[in-house]
C-alpha cells in the first residue's frame, strides 16, 4: 500500500460530510469519495486483489489513518463494517457439527505413532534404554504426531473445503485459533497432571469424535489448572502493575533535547530489526556500505526509512534511547522518540513512565504462570542432515568430539568445536561437505563406511549451551526375583555429610532381576531350609516363635471375632479387706470401696479401665475436713508439707499438725456499682441482699472492691466488732491482722475467751477491731491404710498401694469462695516399681472365692501377645500356619514360647537364601520354580556359556536367536536352560536401592535415575519470571560468572568429584573458581572467556553480573565511563530478557517501555569513598548527581568521590525515590515518613503521585505548561526575552543556587551543567538585540556573593539604575 507524505495528514474540511449514500460503489471508490483529500485526488486508487484477513485489515486501517487522518479512516471503517455485515448476512456463516471434518490421514498418523511407541517399549523391555529415555521418547513421539496432525487438518480444509465456517473463522482471525481447531478435529494431545508432569497417555480423540471416560478425567486436570491459574494471575498481574507505576510515575517528558551523543545499538541479529527501529531517532549518521548517507543524526525513523535500512543491508544502527538520555530526572523528546498513540514525537509533559508501566503490566494476565516441560528438544530447533553419497566419513584434524547419549537413548558423539565433516564417495562424484557447529550430534564415527540417505548429523540450531536441571525418576520392578548387577555398572558407596551411605552407579549398565518366588519372612523368623535345596509344596521354609517376656498365668480371651490375643497375668493384687460397691446415678456409675470399719473410699477409675504409675486409685470420702465457706488458711507450727510434682494435685503432708481456718465469704461479681445494695464497712446479717439477687450466707462486716465503677468483689468477714480509739492497738492489727491466743488482752476493755484472728477495719460508725473466730483441724502424721494382699512374681514387676494425705492449699492462701472447700484429701496411690514407664495396670472386679455375693477390687499387670493368624497363600508371604503352645490357666516362665508360626512353601522348586551381612537377619528367601526357567534345544552347537545373560535376539547358536531374556543356568549338549529375567538400564550417577544378590518383590524400587533435562526457560515462566527480572531477585543457586577475561583451564580435584575452573587473565593473574558438586561446567579447556560469561549452568545473579562488568572495566577506563558502560551492558541484558519472556508468549511490547523502567532501576550508585564532597559513604545517589559533584571537584581541585553502580528492584527503587510522599504512599509508610522527618527532607513535588496526594495540578499533560510557567516565573522578569533567547533562558535556569539575585533564583531543573557567568560580550549582544538600555538591564542585578553570602557595600547595584528599571516597568516595588 502506498503512503503519501505526512503533510497530507489533515483531511480537507468537507471530508466528513461527503459520505457516499450509494451502496453499489466499490470499496476503493467509497474510500476515495469519503476522503477526497488532495493526495487521493492526485493518485489513482490502488487495486489490491487479495484476501483481507484480520492482519491485512489492521494494515489497511493504519495506512488510511497515516495517510488521510482520522475522519477519513472513521468513514472508511464504517463502510467496511457495512460491507462486512451485508455479506455475512447473505453468506450466513454459522457453525454446526457437520462443519467439523476429521482428516482421513488421522488414523495412519496414529498407527505410525503406536508402532513407534511399541518399538520404544520393546527397547525398554530389553534394557536398551532407561525409564527416563522411554518416557521422553513417548512424549516426543506424541508431540510430533500432534504437529503432523495439525498440518493434515490445515491441508484437508484448504484442499477439500476452503469455505468451511470453522476454517474461515480461525483463518481470518475473526474467532478462534489453530490450537482450538486442532482439538475440535485433530486430537487433544498430551495433558499434564496437577504436579505439572506430562502424562504419557495422550488424548487421541477430538471433541467431534468424543472423549472416553479416562480421557475426560485426564482432560479435566488441565481445565481445573487453567481456571485456578487465571484467578491467581489476575492478582499477581495487578500488583506488578502497581509497583511499575510507582517506580516510573515521575518520568515525564520535560525537555525537547538533552543533547546527548550516546545511544544504544540495535542489531539485526537480535531479530525484529525493522520494527524495533520505527519510532526512534538516530544517534549518529547512518551510512551504507558505499559511503552514502542514509540518515543524518536525530532523524526520525519511520517505516519507509527502516525498510531502506534493511534493503541497504545495514546490520546495526545506533539510536537514541531513554536509557542514555541525559535529561535530569526525566526523559527528553528526542531520546524517547515517537509516542506510539499517534506515531509522532512525544509531546512535552507526556507521562511516559505511567504509559510504560501499564504497557508492561497489562499483558500480565495473558502470560501463563508456567508452561509444561515437554521432554526432549522439539524438532523445530534442530536440522537433521542426511548423506547424499555413499562413502567414507572423515572428521578432519580440527574435530573434537565426545561420547554422548541422546535423550532417546541413542549412542552418538557431540562436537566440542566447529569443524567441517566430509563424506568421500566410494566411486566417482563430488564429496559431501557438512559444516558442524558446536553441540551438534554426530551419528557416524571417523572412518566409517556409510550408505546414501543415512542420518549423519543433527545440527544444533545455535551454538548455545542450554542450562539443564537435575531431575529424578524411580525404576520400579515388574517381577519378583533376585537382583544381579552387570560388571559395567561399577557401583560405589558415597557418604554424605550426615554419614548416610548411598550406592551409586558409575557407568551406564543393566540391573537384572532373575525370576523366582520370593517369600517375605516375619520378624524373628529363622529359615529352616538350607540354600540350593529342593523343597516340596507345603514344606516348612521358616519358623517364627513368640515368647513371654515376664511369664505368669495364661489367660486366653474368648474368641472375640477373630482376635488372637494371649494375655499373661504377670502380677496381681486383690484388695481383700474392701468390698466393691457400685451404684448407678444419673451421671453414670459410681464405685466405692468399703472397709470393715465402714470407712468408704470413692473409686477414681471404673473396673475394666487402665491406670498408670502414681495415679490415684481411690479417695477417702471424709467430710471432717470440709468447710462451710471460703477463707484463709494458716498452718500452726509443726505442720510440714512437701510440694507435689504439680500443684494441681495438692501438697503431700510430711508431718501432721494443726491447720487453722479463718472463714470469710467472698462473692466475685462483675456488675455495675449502681446495683450495690449495702455500703463498704457496713455490718450485715445473714441472708442480707448485698447486690441485686445475691444474698450473704453469714453475718459480718462487708468490704467492697470496685474499679472504674464496676464491682469486682464483696467480702463478708464474720466475727464481733469493737469500736476502738487506742492508736497502738489499731496499728498493731492493721494490714493482714494477727492471731491472738485465749485470755490475751487485745485492747483496753477487749479480751477473748477463744483463739481469734484480729484485724483493724473501717466502718461508717468509725474505726475498730474485728475479732474473727477460727476453726482448728487436726491432721494425723500418716494416713491409715487397710490390709492389702500381694501376689509377686519372681521376675515380674512389683505392684503396691500407698496412702497419702494431700492438702489442697499452702500456708497463708486465701480461698475466694461462697461454698465450702475440702482442705485435706486422703488418697490411695498406685506404685509399680518397674523400669518401663509406659507399664499400665488393669483394674478388675472379681467375685470373692468364699462369699460369692461380694465383689473385690483386683489390680493386675498383663502382658499381651498378639498371635499371627493363619493366612492362605498370598502373593508375597506364602501360606502361614500358627500354633499355640499353651493352654488357658497354665503357668509359664519368662521367655517360654507361647506360639510358633510356620511359613509353608506354595510351589515346589529350589530354595535359595540371599546374601546377608554377618549378624543381619534373613528377611526374604526365594524358591526357583519350574516356570521360572525355560529349556531350549538348538540345532547347531550352542555359542553361550553358563552365567551369560541374554536378551531377545541374542544368538544361542548360529542363526538361532533367543526368544526371551534371562541367564544361562546350564548347557547340556544342545539343550540350554535359561532362568527367565528382566533387564533394567540404569544411567551413570543413579542411586541404587538394592545390592547385588538382594531379593525383590514386584513393585519394589530398584533405583532412582538421576537425569538432566533441558530447562527450555519454561521452569520459571511468564509472570514469575518477569517479576524475578524486574525485582532483580538473587537466585538461590546462581551460575558462577567469570570476573575478568582470559583463557580457561579445567582442573579435576583429587577425589574426581570437585572441579576447579582457573582463568588465566591478561596480566597473567590467575582467577580460581571452585565448582560445586552437581554443577555443569559450560566452558572447555583453552576457551577464551569474557567478564560476566557463564562458567557453569544456572540462573544468573544480575547484581553479580553488574559487579563483574564494572570491576573489569574499572581497571581500563575512568570511573565514570566504566560505570556507564557496565550499566549499559546490564540494561541491554535486562531489556532483552524481559522481551524474551513476552515474545515467547506472543505478546509484543515496544522496547522503549521496558527501557524507561530499567532506567529507573539502574539510575543510582552507592558512594564508597566521599572524597572532598559532601556525600556520605553508603549513600544511594543518582549517577548524574555524582557526575556533577565530581565535575565541580575537578574545577576546585578537590578529591572526587568513589562509587559503584547498583541495581535496584522496582520495589526498592520506589522506596528510594527523592519524593518521600510517593515512597510513603507505596509501602512501609511509617518507616519512610520517620526517616524523612529525621533527615529533614524536602519534597519538590516533581512526580504525579506527590501532586495528586497534596491536591495540586499534576505536572503532566495540560498541567505541564503551568509547571513550566512556574519555572519561568522563577527564572526572571523577562519571559519574552527568555523565550526568544534560549541560551539566555538556559543560563538563567542553570544559575547555581549560591548566586544571589534580586529575584527568586531558578532551581536547577532541566540540566545540572554548571555554566560560567554571562560574559560582557554576551550581555551586550542580548541588550542590543532587544534594544534595552544598559543602565536598565536586568542582568546588572547579578552579582557574586562572598563567603559569608552577604553582599559587600560596593557590590550593591546603583540606586539610580534600580530607579530606572522601575520607571521602565521592568522591576516592581517588591
From Swiss-Prot:
Its cofactor is Zn(2+). It catalyses: RNA(n) + a ribonucleoside 5'-triphosphate = RNA(n+1) + diphosphate. The keyword Cell wall biogenesis/degradation does not apply. It is an enzyme of class 2 (transferase). One of its GO terms (cellular component) is DNA-directed RNA polymerase complex. Residues 1-47, 1344-1374 are annotated as: Disordered. Zn(2+) binds at residues 258, 325, 332, 335. GO terms for molecular function: DNA binding; DNA-directed RNA polymerase activity; zinc ion binding. Residues 29-39, 1362-1374 have a biased composition (Low complexity). Its EC number is 2.7.7.6. Keywords: DNA-directed RNA polymerase, Metal-binding, Nucleotidyltransferase, Transcription, Transferase, Zinc. One of its GO terms (biological process) is DNA-templated transcription. Residues 7-28 have a biased composition (Basic residues). InterPro entries: DNA-dir_RpoC2_beta_pp, DNA-dir_RpoC_beta_prime, RNA_pol_Rpb1_3, RNA_pol_Rpb1_3_sf, RNA_pol_Rpb1_4, RNA_pol_Rpb1_5, Rpb1_funnel_sf. Binds 1 Zn(2+) ion per subunit. NCBIfam families: PRK02597.1, rpoC2_cyan. DNA-dependent RNA polymerase catalyzes the transcription of DNA into RNA using the four ribonucleoside triphosphates as substrates. In cyanobacteria the RNAP catalytic core is composed of 2 alpha, 1 beta, 1 beta', 1 gamma and 1 omega subunit. When a sigma factor is associated with the core the holoenzyme is formed, which can initiate transcription. Belongs to the RNA polymerase beta' chain family. RpoC2 subfamily. This is DNA-directed RNA polymerase subunit beta'. It comes from Prochlorococcus marinus (strain MIT 9313). The gene is rpoC2.
Amino acid at each position: 500500500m502506498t503512503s503519501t507524505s505526512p503533510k497530507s495528514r489533515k483531511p480537507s474540511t468537507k471530508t466528513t460530510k461527503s459520505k457516499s449514500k450509494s451502496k453499489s460503489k466499490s470499496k476503493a471508490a467509497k474510500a476515495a469519495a469519503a476522503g477526497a483529500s488532495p493526495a487521493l485526488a492526485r493518485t489513482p486508487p490502488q487495486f489490491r486483489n487479495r484476501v483481507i484477513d484480520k492482519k491485512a485489515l489492521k494494515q489497511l486501517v493504519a495506512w488510511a489513518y497515516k495517510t488521510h487522518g482520522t475522519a477519513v479512516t472513521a468513514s472508511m471503517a464504517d463502510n467496511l463494517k457495512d460491507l462486512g455485515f451485508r455479506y455475512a448476512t447473505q453468506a450466513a456463516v454459522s457453525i454446526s457439527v457437520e462443519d467439523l471434518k476429521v482428516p482421513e490421514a488421522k488414523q495412519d498418523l496414529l498407527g505410525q505413532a503406536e508402532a513407534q511407541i511399541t518399538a520404544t517399549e520393546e527397547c525398554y523391555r530389553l534394557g536398551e534404554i532407561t525409564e527416563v529415555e522411554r518416557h521422553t521418547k513417548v512424549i516426543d513421539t506424541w508431540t510430533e504426531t500432534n504437529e503432523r496432525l495439525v498440518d493434515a487438518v490445515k491441508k484437508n480444509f484448504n484442499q477439500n473445503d476452503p469455505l468451511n465456517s470453522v476454517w474461515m473463522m480461525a483463518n481470518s482471525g475473526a474467532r478462534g485459533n489453530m490450537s482450538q481447531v486442532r482439538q475440535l478435529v485433530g486430537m487433544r494431545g498430551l495433558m499434564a497432571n496437577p504436579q505439572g508432569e506430562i502424562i504419557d497417555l495422550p488424548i487421541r480423540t477430538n471433541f467431534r469424535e468424543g472423549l472416553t471416560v479416562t480421557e475426560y478425567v485426564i482432560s479435566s486436570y488441565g481445565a481445573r489448572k487453567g481456571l485456578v491459574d487465571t484467578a491467581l494471575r489476575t492478582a499477581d498481574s495487578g500488583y506488578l502493575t502497581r509497583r511499575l507505576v510507582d517506580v516510573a510515575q515521575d518520568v515525564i517528558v520535560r525537555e525537547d533535547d538533552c543533547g546527548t551523543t550516546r545511544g544504544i545499538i540495535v542489531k539485526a541479529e537480535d531479530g525484529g530489526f525493522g520494527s524495533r527501529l520505527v519510532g526512534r531517532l538516530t544517534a549518529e549518521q547512518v551510512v551504507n556500505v558505499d559511503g552514502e548517507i542514509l540518515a543524518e543524526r536525530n532523524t526520525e525513523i519511520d517505516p519507509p526509512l527502516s525498510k531502506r535500512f534493511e534493503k541497504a543491508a545495514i546490520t546495526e544502527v545506533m539510536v537514541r534511547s531513554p536509557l542514555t538520555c541525559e535529561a535530569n530526572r526525566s526523559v527528553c523528546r528526542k531520546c524517547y522518540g515517537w509516542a506510539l498513540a499517534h506515531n509522532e514525537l512525544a509531546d512535552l509533559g507526556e507521562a511516559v513512565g505511567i504509559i510504560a508501566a501499564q504497557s508492561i503490566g497489562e499483558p500480565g494476565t495473558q502470560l501463563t504462570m508456567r508452561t509444561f516441560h515437554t521432554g526432549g528438544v522439539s524438532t523445530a530447533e534442530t536440522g537433521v542432515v542426511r548423506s547424499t553419497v555413499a562413502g567414507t566419513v572423515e572428521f578432519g584434524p580440527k574435530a573434537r568430539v565426545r561420547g554422548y547419549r541422546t535423550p532417546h537413548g541413542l549412542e552418538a558423539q557431540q562436537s566440542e568445536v566447529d569443524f567441517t565433516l566430509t563424506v568421500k564417495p566410494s566411486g566417482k562424484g563430488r564429496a559431501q561437505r557438512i559444516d558442524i557447529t558446536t553441540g551438534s550430534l554426530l551419528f557416524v564415527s571417523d572412518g566409517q563406511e556409510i550408505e546414501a540417505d543415512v542420518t549423519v548429523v543433527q545440527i544444533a540450531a545455535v551454538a548455545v549451551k542450554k542450562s539443564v536441571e537435575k531431575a529424578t525418576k524411580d525404576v520400579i520392578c515388574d517381577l519378583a526375583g533376585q537382583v544381579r548387577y552387570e560388571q559395567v555398572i561399577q557401583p560405589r558407596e558415597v557418604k554424605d555429610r550426615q554419614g548416610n551411605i548411598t550406592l551409586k552407579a558409575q557407568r551406564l549398565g543393566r540391573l537384572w532381576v532373575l525370576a523366582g518366588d520370593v517369600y517375605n519372612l516375619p520378624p524373628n523368623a529363622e529359615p529352616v531350609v538350607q540354600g540350593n535345596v529342593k523343597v516340596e509344596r507345603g514344606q516348612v521354609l521358616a519358623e517364627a516363635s513368640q515368647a513371654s517376656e515376664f511369664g505368669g498365668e495364661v489367660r486366653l480371651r474368648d474368641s472375640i471375632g477373630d482376635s488372637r490375643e494371649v494375655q499373661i497375668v504377670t502380677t496381681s493384687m486383690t484388695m481383700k479387706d474392701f468390698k466393691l460397691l457400685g451404684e448407678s446415678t444419673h451421671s453414670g456409675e459410681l464405685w466405692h470401696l468399703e472397709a470393715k470399719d465402714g470407712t468408704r473410699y470413692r473409686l477414681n477409675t471404673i473396673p475394666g479401665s487402665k491406670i498408670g504409675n502414681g495415679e490415684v486409685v481411690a479417695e477417702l470420702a471424709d467430710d471432717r475436713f470440709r468447710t462451710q465457706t471460703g477463707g484463709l488458711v494458716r498452718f500452726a507450727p509443726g505442720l510440714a508439707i512437701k510440694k507435689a510434682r504439680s500443684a494441681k494435685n495438692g501438697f503431700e503432708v510430711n508431718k501432721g499438725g494443726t491447720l487453722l481456718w479463718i472463714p470469710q465469704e467472698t462473692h466475685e461479681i462483675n456488675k455495675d456499682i449502681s446495683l450495690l445494695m449495702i455500703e463498704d464497712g457496713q455490718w450485715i446479717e445473714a441472708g442480707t441482699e448485698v447486690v441485686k439477687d445475691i444474698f450473704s450466707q453469714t453475718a459480718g462486716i462487708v468490704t467492697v472492691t470496685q474499679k472504674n465503677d464496676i464491682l469486682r468483689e464483696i467480702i463478708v468477714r464474720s466475727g464481733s466488732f469493737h469500736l476502738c480509739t487506742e492508736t497502738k492497738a489499731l496499728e498493731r492489727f492493721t494490714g493482714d491482722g494477727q492471731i491472738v491466743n485465749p485470755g490475751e488482752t487485745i485492747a483496753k476493755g477487749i479480751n477473748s475467751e477463744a483463739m481469734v484472728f484480729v484485724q483493724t477495719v473501717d466502718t461508717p460508725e468509725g474505726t475498730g477491731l474485728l475479732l474473727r473466730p477460727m476453726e482448728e483441724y487436726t491432721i494425723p502424721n500418716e494416713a491409715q491404710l487397710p490390709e492389702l494382699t500381694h501376689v509377686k512374681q519372681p521376675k515380674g514387676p512389683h505392684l503396691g498401694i500407698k496412702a497419702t494425705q494431700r492438702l489442697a492449699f499452702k500456708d497463708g492462701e486465701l480461698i475466694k469462695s461462697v461454698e465450702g472447700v475440702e482442705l485435706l484429701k486422703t488418697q490411695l496411690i498406685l506404685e509399680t516399681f518397674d523400669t518401663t514407664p509406659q507399664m499400665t495396670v488393669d483394674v478388675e472386679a472379681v467375685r470373692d472365692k468364699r462369699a460369692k455375693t461380694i465383689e473385690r477390687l483386683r489390680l493386675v499387670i498383663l502382658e499381651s501377645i498378639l498371635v499371627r493368624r493363619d493366612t492362605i497363600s498370598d502373593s508375597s508371604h506364602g501360606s502361614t500356619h500358627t500354633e499355640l503352645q499353651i493352654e488357658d490357666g497354665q503357668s509359664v516362665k519368662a521367655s517360654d514360647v507361647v506360639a510358633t508360626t510356620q511359613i509353608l512353601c506354595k510351589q515346589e522348586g529350589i530354595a535359595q537364601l540371599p546374601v546377608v551381612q554377618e549378624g543381619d537377619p534373613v528377611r526374604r528367601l526365594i524358591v526357583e520354580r519350574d516356570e521360572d526357567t525355560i529349556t531350549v534345544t538348538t540345532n547347531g552347537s550352542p555359542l553361550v556359556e553358563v552365567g551369560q545373560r541374554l536378551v531377545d535376539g541374542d544368538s544361542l547358536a548360529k542363526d538361532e536367536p533367543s526368544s526371551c531374556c534371562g541367564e544361562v543356568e546350564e548347557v547340556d549338549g544342545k539343550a540350554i536352560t535359561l532362568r527367565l529375567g528382566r533387564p533394567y538400564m540404569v544411567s551413570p550417577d543413579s542411586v541404587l536401592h538394592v545390592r547385588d544378590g538382594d531379593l525383590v518383590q514386584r513393585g519394589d524400587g530398584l533405583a532412582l535415575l538421576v537425569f538432566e533435562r533441558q530447562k527450555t526457560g519454561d521452569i520459571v515462566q511468564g509472570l514469575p519470571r518477569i517479576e524475578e527480572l524486574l525485582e532483580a531477585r538473587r537466585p538461590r543457586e546462581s551460575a558462577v560468572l567469570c570476573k575478568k577475561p582470559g583463557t580457561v583451564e579445567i582442573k579435576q580435584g583429587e577425589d574426581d568429584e570437585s572441579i576447579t575452573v582457573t582463568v588465566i587473565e591478561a596480566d597473567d593473574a590467575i582467577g580460581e573458581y571452585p565448582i560445586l558438586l552437581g554443577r555443569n561446567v559450560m566452558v572447555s579447556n583453552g576457551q577464551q572467556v569474557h567478564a560476566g560469561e557463564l562458567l557453569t549452568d544456572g540462573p544468573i545473579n544480575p547484581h553479580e553480573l553488574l559487579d563483574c562488568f564494572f570491576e573489569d572495566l574499572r581497571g581500563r577506563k575512568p570511573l565514570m565511563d566504566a560505570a556507564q558502560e557496565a550499566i549499559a551492558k546490564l540494561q541491554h541484558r535486562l531489556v532483552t530478557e524481559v522481551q524474551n519472556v513476552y515474545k515467547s508468549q506472543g505478546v509484543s511490547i515496544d522496547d522503549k517501555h521496558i527501557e524507561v523502567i530499567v532506567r529507573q532501576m539502574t539510575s543510582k550508585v552507592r558512594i564508597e569513598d566521599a572524597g572532598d564532597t559532601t556525600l556520605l559513604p553508603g549513600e544511594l545517589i543518582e549517577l548524574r548527581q555524582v557526575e556533577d559533584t565530581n565535575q565541580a571537584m575537578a574545577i576546585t581541585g578537590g578529591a572526587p568521590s568513589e562509587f559503584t553502580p547498583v541495581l535496584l528492584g522496582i520495589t526498592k527503587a520506589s522506596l528510594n525515590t527523592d519524593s518521600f510522599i510517593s515512597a510513603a504512599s507505596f509501602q512501609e509508610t511509617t518507616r519512610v515518613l520517620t526517616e524523612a522527618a529525621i533527615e529533614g527532607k524536602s519534597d519538590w513535588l516533581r512526580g504525579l503521585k506527590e501532586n495528586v496526594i497534596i491536591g495540586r495540578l499534576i505536572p503532566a499533560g495540560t498541567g505541564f505548561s503551568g509547571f513550566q510557567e512556574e519555572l519561568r516565573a522563577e527564572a526572571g522578569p523577562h519571559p519574552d526575552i527568555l523565550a526568544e533567547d534560549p541560551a539566555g533562558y538556559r543560563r538563567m535556569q542553570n544559575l547555581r543556587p549560591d548566586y544571589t539575585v534580586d529575584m527568586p533564583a531558578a532551581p536547577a531543573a532541566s540540566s545540572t551543567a554548571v555554566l560560567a557567568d554571562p560574559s560582557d560580550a554576551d550581555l551586550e549582544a542580548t541588550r542590543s538585540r532587544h534594544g534595552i538600555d544598559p543602565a536598565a538591564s536586568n542582568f546588572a542585578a547579578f552579582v557574586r556573593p562572598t563567603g559569608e553570602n552577604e553582599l559587600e557595600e560596593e557590590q550593591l547595584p546603583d540606586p539610580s539604575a534600580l530607579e530606572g528599571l522601575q520607571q521602565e516597568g521592568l522591576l516592581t516595588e517588591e
